[in-house]
Amino acid sequence: MRLLFAVTATAVALAVVAAGCGSTGRSGTTPSSSTAAATTTAAGALQAEANATVAGDIPDNQVFLTFRNSQAGYSMKYPEGWAQQGSGGVVTFRDKNNAVRAIVSSGAAWTKAAVQADAQALKGARVQGQPQAFTLSGRPAFKVVYQTVSAPNPVTGKRVTLTVDRYYLWKQGRRAVLDLGCPLGVDNVDAYRLISESFRWN
């Protein structure tokens, strides 16, 4: 299974679905997702290429490695064995119908208005609720959750619906959008919380 990502030319840099991929049940650090919603201001909605079966549960014993992006100036964890695509400002990791994408660029700090505008501009995505402000690993952030549907599989006609948690992050003239997507109904909360909380600016 292969995940495809559409990114607009101005890529820069998340409310609520009944069990968003990267939502956390904890209060105080990462907000919990309880309805579907959202994405970023220069990156299009995360897209999946439909496969015959929907798979995506990340095993409890999954090993995570640290990805260091010296060009974009950040590091984050990702599941060992996932395929990496891209470099610099746009990097994705994918496996089956799961996908994690980081988009980094220069720009002012994200505001609620800017996040709302970004989410409203997303094509091919269904966003619900308002951006949620919270603290991620000690730094301010916003989160939006959205759903996006793949094109039909050319053989089976099957479509895959992804639930995507989108995080908006920033620091000193740089900003990032972090998308974590998985098939609707798949519970990757713990793994995606680990990934989102591991993001560090250099």
Where in the sequence are the language-model features?
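N-terminal targeting sequences that direct proteins away from the cytosol to non-cytosolic compartments
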Residues: 2-98, 171-174, 179-202
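Conserved polar/disulfide-associated segments of primarily extracytoplasmic proteins
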Residues: 42-55, 84-194
